[in-house]
């Protein structure tokens, strides 16, 4: 009897040890595709990685991250996603609307869950059935832009502004809704506007030259990744011409735009990682996991550009204060990591 009891205890211990080892060895492969190399999207991915590493330490699991960047190339994007499917990743992350849309169409038959990050209009892009109940294998985080809030800041800084440039890439779904909202708002106010577009950096630079030649009073750009990628190439000439550039993300201001308003992309990245954890570790039903939205109402002003425009930062911060939760300064740099150097 004692031998039998000893054998049972030994087996129990062995099974427990095996179970513990299995739990320790639990690993998940996450495929991340970035749309373009810019400060906003890079910050999102950096914070996804950091947050997943924290969770890995807290919960004794491993995340293997496969990351690639299509750099605005649709065929490269499809190849990256095909590779993720072939590698049988446990979950995909699509950073920005075009990547999310392609991931959705390519994974519908696979059952691979997709978490999108920084999609401005998930409903308009046809990614989800509703913001509260996406209804398929995809959900994520949205960087929806309050266009009216940005225009409140434009007219707070310059009540006499009467000629507004709308600078964007018409091919970007992220720009469709905010540009339509901007037109409606300006038409209601009886303020003239003109559209300028570009699909790559060279075209955006030419568009900026046209804005200067047309002597516009201000420029509005939503969360447009094409313009974001070109900001370092246009901010100086706009500032020298005395034309402030108002944009939909703090990363534009980091790269020299006068103002960035909207979502904190570091926070969005961490929230995206938490959604990954909910699906992979906690067993959440992705079809019922609501899209996350953010509204921190922060206006980020580039103090270098502010000075180049001949504006006083303190006066601008005071003018902006009634229209946002906070006003914060930033100086020009290529990436957020450079600010700490």
Where are the regions that the model predicts?
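Extracytoplasmic "Venus flytrap"
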Residues: 29-50, 55, 66-76, 171-175, ...
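Hinge/cleft segment of the Venus flytrap/periplasmic-binding protein
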Residues: 278-341
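Hydrophobic alpha-helical segments within soluble ligand-binding/sensing domains
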Residues: 121-163, 263-284
């Amino acid at each position: 009897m004692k031998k039998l009891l000893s054998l049972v205890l030994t087996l129990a211990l062995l099974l427990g040890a095996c179970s513990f080892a299995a739990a320790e060895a639990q690993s998940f492969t996450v495929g991340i595709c970035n749309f373009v190399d810019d400060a906003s999207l890079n910050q999102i991915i950096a914070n996804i990685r950091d947050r997943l590493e924290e969770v890995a330490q807290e919960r004794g699991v491993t995340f293997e991250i496969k990351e690639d960047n299509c750099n605005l190339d649709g065929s490269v994007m499809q190849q990256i996603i095909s590779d993720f499917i072939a590698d049988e990743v446990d979950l995909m992350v699509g950073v920005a609307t075009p990547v999310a849309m392609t991931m959705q169409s390519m994974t519908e038959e696979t059952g691979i869950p997709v978490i999108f990050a920084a999609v401005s209009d998930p409903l308009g892009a046809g990614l989800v059935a509703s913001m509260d109940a996406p209804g398929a294998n995809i959900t994520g985080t949205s960087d929806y832009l309050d266009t009216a809030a940005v225009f409140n800041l434009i007219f707070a800084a310059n009540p006499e502004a009467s000629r507004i440039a709308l600078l964007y890439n018409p091919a970007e779904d992220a720009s469709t809704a905010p540009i339509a909202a901007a037109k409606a708002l300006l038409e209601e106010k009886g303020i003239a506007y003109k559209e300028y577009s570009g699909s790559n950096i060279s075209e955006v630079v030419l568009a900026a030259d046209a804005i200067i030649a047309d002597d516009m009073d201000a420029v509005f750009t939503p969360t447009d990744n094409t313009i974001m990628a070109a900001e370092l190439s246009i901010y100086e000439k706009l500032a020298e011409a005395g034309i402030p550039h108002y944009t939909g993300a703090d990363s534009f201001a980091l790269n020299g735009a006068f103002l960035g308003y909207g979502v904190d992309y570091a926070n969005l990245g961490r929230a995206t990682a938490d959604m990954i954890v909910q699906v992979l570790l906690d067993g959440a039903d992705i079809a019922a996991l609501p899209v996350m939205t953010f509204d921190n109402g922060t206006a980020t002003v580039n103090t270098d550009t502010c000075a180049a425009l001949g504006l006083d930062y303190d006066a601008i911060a005071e003018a902006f204060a009634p229209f946002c939760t906070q006003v914060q300064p930033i100086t020009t740099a290529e990436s957020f990591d450079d600010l700490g150097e």
